[in-house]
Amino acid sequence: MKTLLRLFLVRVPLGIGMLCLVLSAALSLPVPVKADGLASVPLEIVDSDRTELGDGLAHYRYDVVVGSGKYDVVRIHRIVREDRPNKPVRTRDAVMLLHGNPGSFAGFVAPMVTGVSEMDHSIAIFLAKQDIDVWGMDFGWALVPPEETDFEFMGDWGLAKDVAHTEAALTFARSIRVDTGQGNGKLHVLGFSYGGQVGYTLLGNETVQPRGLRNVKGMIVLDVGVKLENEGDREFYCAMALIDQASLESDPPVYVNRIGSLFNLAAYLASTDPDGTSPIVAGLTNWQAVLFIGASTERITGQFWHMVGGYLDEYGVPSSLRFTEDQLFVATVGTTFAPYYPVRIDFDTEQMMCGAVDTPLDDGLSQITVPILHIGAKGGFGPSAYASSTFTASRDVTTITVQRLPDSDEAMDFGHVDTVLARDAETLVWQPILDWIMAHRENRP
């Protein structure tokens, strides 16, 4: 989540079947990737597996080396319906899901990972059941283990590196799709939160590539932006960019944001001692603290959005959540949030949202022409983030705002994370996404 709790806490060509036979062997694919000055390297699969999910669905996972650094490894996921094991159906289209920070791909399949709620209450499962070839990726920082203590490697790990890794993952996905009979068509990108900012930047970069070398044909942005309409919102991120710049330039420099580990701790305490006194939010129980962090995010960070809508008292303390099951949210916080991510990606995205700083990361925005679907939560980034698409040259832009309460109750309305977890997210968010994908489906022979 963007700068979450920062003001509250010091930042303390191979077939699927064949692939399953070579789990212990490294396979190099001749796909170069270059990020932040790193030399181009071939993609190398170092681990993979397949899991049957039921209802004819399977989950494939590939750990792929995309650079020369210790943690230059991404985890690429595929959830797809199959005719038989290792034989995907001929899908109707394909999409790559990109998660937020400090999240992971698991957030898109939270019920499956946490065991809370029905497994198919998941945007990834929902789309796969409709014969969409669903891909996803864990950014490399999401795979850094909790026991890591040396974060020098995060010093130059910024948005550009994640964009390059995503481009490599898209190329990888297309190569697998060719081998499993899906053709070589481009993919849509669906970016939630930070993933949407990666999507905008990636598409901007692709505009300088020949059309035949581009990987993306359309973009779905889920409650985030790279440009904001509201001046107060822009000023907030200008201020946060200065704070992050100071962290990066301090002696010693601070390269890591540890907010994910705080989330993990808060959720652990809520699960093991729900009625105990919270060491994280004074005056609340451990259970209340997690709900407060989710439903009253604004009161902690000063930002204009919250993660999940809640039933709030006059102090902003939620009795429960409005749209997402309490237990699902707590379990998601505890199991799908990565403990660490680089400060530099906050700095990079804050500069873009600030709008007052010249950054090369948004240089390609004005050349983007692909179709864009931008869905905002009224209690999240919402309509303010729709300004992002006005900086592009796309003539096919659709915006959808999910609003469940009157304007006067915006502080309790449908939130940022409700878009992927809410009880009625399938109707309000996922079905419109599916409809848009089908409306932009490429003709097939």
Language-model features, listed with the residues they occupy:
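Conserved loop-alpha-helix segment in the C-terminal half of the alpha/beta-hydrolase fold
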Residues: 375-414
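Catalytic active-site module of serine/aspartate enzymes centered on a nucleophile-bearing elbow/loop
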Residues: 400-445
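Gly/Ala-rich beta-loop-alpha elbow adjacent to hydrolase catalytic centers
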Residues: 190-195, 199
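Active-site nucleophile loop of the alpha/beta-hydrolase fold
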Residues: 220-229
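Alpha/beta-hydrolase active-site loop
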Residues: 154-179
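Short, surface-exposed "cap/lid" segments of acyl-processing enzymes
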Residues: 83-138
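Alpha/beta-hydrolase
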Residues: 234-385
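N-terminal cap/lid segment of alpha/beta-hydrolase-fold proteins
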Residues: 38-90
